[in-house]
Design a protein with these regions (language model features):
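Short acidic, glycine/tyrosine-flanked loop/strand segments centered on an H-E-D-like triad
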Residues: 75-100
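Alpha-helical scaffold segments that mediate packing/assembly in large oligomeric complexes
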Residues: 97-168, 310-320
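Extended, compositionally biased alpha-helical segments that mediate assembly or anchoring
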Residues: 273-320
Length: 320
């Protein structure tokens, strides 16, 4: 008969320590906001605000041959300011805790956790700034996104939201939407439907999308790629580069607000890039380390009414 010398409820079990060998960090959405913004630097000795100045328009007129030009106009300028504020995150690790804990890399891992927290706030602040565009809002609460919403919003941005005084922006135009809306957008591009003839559109504002087959519509490489890779294959629709960010807030009614905007219209001003600053100088804390990650930045809009349109759509969790 075999003798069990160690194990749960057996001999010597009190002598078996619990040793953890796998240590993992919870993952946050890394986000895309800095990649779709115009980045600027508030350098030392430049004050507390970064300014962008733009000059107004003047109008050209027909004049009669030989007549004196009497059309003098005032040239005006407008300054838009962006004032960074500090952001910080802190954890204090006790000296005795670090000596006793099973994770030999606790200090380094904690530093990465703090950096992740800073990055999460930075990106979330950027998604919140999208609501400050003041062009025409596309969609509404409960509306399911479609390709036409994206291309329509992009078409407006391409003329600066004005037919009377077109103001085409420089650079790329982006759409930042929630991944759950992008999932539906991708399904409508295949398109998925609940009947073979394609009479019912894919997507519902309660998450019951019902797409069980492929209906007639667009075909080719993009559709095939979307079927394989989902919304990550969206790419560009109507000259608008579609990006997703799960840090966009979804309200109690399953709706979110993102934007279709010109990169020129979303501003990120950095004063201090995030830095990890460990401090163990306080001897009364007996070996404790105070870990601080801090930086200084601000998000803002430029030409908010011309260069961006908010978009509000459903972001229900899929149920079918």
């Amino acid at each position: 008969m075999a003798t069990v010398l160690a194990g749960p409820g057996q001999a010597l079990d009190a002598s078996l320590p619990t040793i953890y060998r796998e240590f993992r960090l919870l993952r946050d959405e890394t986000g895309v906001m800095r990649s779709v913004a115009t980045s600027m630097k508030l350098a030392a000795h430049e004050g507390n605000t970064k300014y962008i100045s733009n000059y107004g328009r003047v109008t050209a007129y027909n004049v009669s041959d030989g007549a004196d030009i009497a059309q003098a106009q005032n040239l005006a300028d407008t300054a838009t300011g962006y004032s960074p504020t500090e952001v910080a995150v802190q954890v204090i690790l006790g000296g005795r805790t670090m000596r006793r804990v099973a994770d030999p890399d606790l200090l380094g891992r904690t530093g990465r956790i703090l950096n992740n927290a800073y990055d999460l706030k930075e990106d979330t602040d950027g998604t919140t700034q999208l609501q400050s565009f003041t062009g025409t809002t596309m969609g509404a609460a409960g509306v399911v996104i479609s390709p036409g919403h994206i291309s329509g919003a992009g078409a407006r941005v391409m003329i600066g939201n004005s037919r009377a005084n077109p103001e085409p922006p420089n650079g790329d135009i982006f759409a930042v939407i929630h991944p759950l809306a992008a999932h539906v957008l991708a399904g409508r591009l295949v398109p998925y439907t609940d009947v073979p003839t394609g009479t019912t559109a894919f997507g519902a504002n309660n998450g019951a999308h019902g797409g069980v087959t492929v209906g007639p519509g667009r075909s080719g490489g993009m559709s095939d790629d979307i079927i394989r890779r989902g919304y990550k294959a969206l790419g560009t629709i109507g000259s608008v580069i579609v990006k997703t960010d799960a840090n966009l807030a979804v309200d109690a009614n399953d709706d979110f607000t993102g934007a279709v905007f010109a990169k020129e219209g979303l501003i990120y001003v950095s004063e201090e890039e995030p830095r990890l600053d460990p401090d163990s100088s306080d001897k009364s804390m007996r070996g404790a380390v105070e870990l601080n990650v801090w930086g200084s930045y601000v998000w803002g809009n430029y030409r908010a009414s011309a260069y961006g349109n908010p978009v509000t759509f459903d972001a229900s969790l899929p149920t079918s």
